[in-house]
Amino acid sequence: MEDEEVAESWEEAADSGEIDRRLEKKLKITQKESRKSKSPPKVPIVIQDDSLPAGPPPQIRILKRPTSNGVVSSPNSTSRPTLPVKSLAQREAEYAEARKRILGSASPEEEQEKPILDRPTRISQPEDSRQPNNVIRQPLGPDGSQGFKQRR
């Protein structure tokens, strides 16, 4: 490849026959390599004969996982201890205690009884001092024309 001429374009290379020579050269190299590599396959191929009986299928055993003390537990026993059932009063007491710890109040009713002072209250005006609701607008167009009132 040191003495090779490089054509200006592929059209010049095709006209001069340079592309054909390079292709033939590469084809010869690949044919030589393929002849060398036609040795027998390195992995043996096992062909099973259907006339011979097949061996027994492999047995699968499911093993039990031992518990922490090394004894295998039976499938019917549960490894978790049963929790005592709490009454409604006990659950409400625990809830109130947790709510007091987190929110600072024991019951949700206390929150609802307090008026919310963050929002301003709406001051109602007497009926006669209110503005009339029937506002008539007469829009103008972008160039100062009559807008929607203009007839075409």
Swiss-Prot record:
Modified residues (N-acetylmethionine): 1
Domain SUZ-C: 111-152
Phosphoserine, modified sites: 37, 39, 51, 105, 107
Domain SUZ: 42-107
Alphabetically ordered keywords of this record: Acetylation, Phosphoprotein
Segments of skewed composition (Basic and acidic residues): 89-100, 113-130
Transmembrane annotation, as ranges: none
Signal sequence, renumbered to the chain: none
Compositionally biased intervals (Polar residues): 66-81
InterPro entries named among the record's database cross-references: SUZ, SUZ-C, SZRD1
Similarity comment: family membership: Belongs to the SZRD1 family.
The name this protein goes by in its record: SUZ RNA-binding domain-containing
Organism: Homo sapiens
Gene: SZRD1
